[in-house]
Each structure stands twice: as structure tokens, then as C-alpha cells.
Amino acid sequence: RRYPGSAQTWTLIAAAALCLVLVTGTMVTGSGPHSGDAGVGMEGRLQMDTRVLAYVHSVCMYLYLIATIITTVLLRNSGAPDDAKRTAYVLIAMILVQWAIGVIQFRMGVPRWTIPAHIAMSSVVVAFSGFLFAHGKRRLPTLV
């Protein structure tokens, strides 16, 4: 183990919250104007209120951010390895970039050009979440 169990527990809590973010984000996309073939029209889309789903999605994102911040504080206060702390800091920065893109999307009425950016950043956030979890255990011997 490379950092305390409490930080690993919060990493798992953050991962669960991230799953909720991803599911609700998919639902927001599925209910919106850019969710599929333009010829299908809104009848072929998820028949839920996009605005309400966006609010649920944002609440899940805030829970994820809070869990990630708690994890980061635990890592910093426990003397965890520097690579784990750096990953946590980068992850928080990436979550905030993703948040900003989402707010821009919401306030601008989901312009088409924002969707690839939001999806790409989602991939970055998921990857760094995995990196942070992986820093919790040393799987290979250190060479230095």
C-alpha cells in the first residue's frame, strides 16, 4: 500500500460518484438536441427533461469533486508519495476544466462544438481517476 486506507476508501467513493456523473451525463446527452440522427427528430430521443437531468448531473459532479478533494487532502496530510499527490492535483484541475465546459454548454444552449470537448475531457477525468486509484498500490518494483 502506498497511501492510507482512508484515502483509498475515498478514492473508491469518488469513483462511485464518477459513475453517477457518467450515467447522468449520458442521459443529458440522450435527451438533448444532439443525441442522434437529425432525421429522427426529438421523438427518438430520451423523453426526459434535459434541464432537470443537467441539474442532477451537476449535483453528481459536485459530489465527485468533493470526494476527490477529500481524497487529495487525505493524501497531502498522510505523507503519500508525491506522484499520487500530483495526480490528485491534476485530477482536480481537470474536473474544474470539465465543469467549466459543462457550464458553458448549459448556458449557451448546448452548441454542437462543445460536445466533443466535453466528451474528450470526460475521458481525461476518467483516466486520471484511474491513475489516482492505481497509485494506491505498488504493482511493480521500483527501479530507483
Which residues are covered by each model-predicted region?
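Polytopic transmembrane helical bundles with strong interfacial aromatic enrichment
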Residues: 1-144
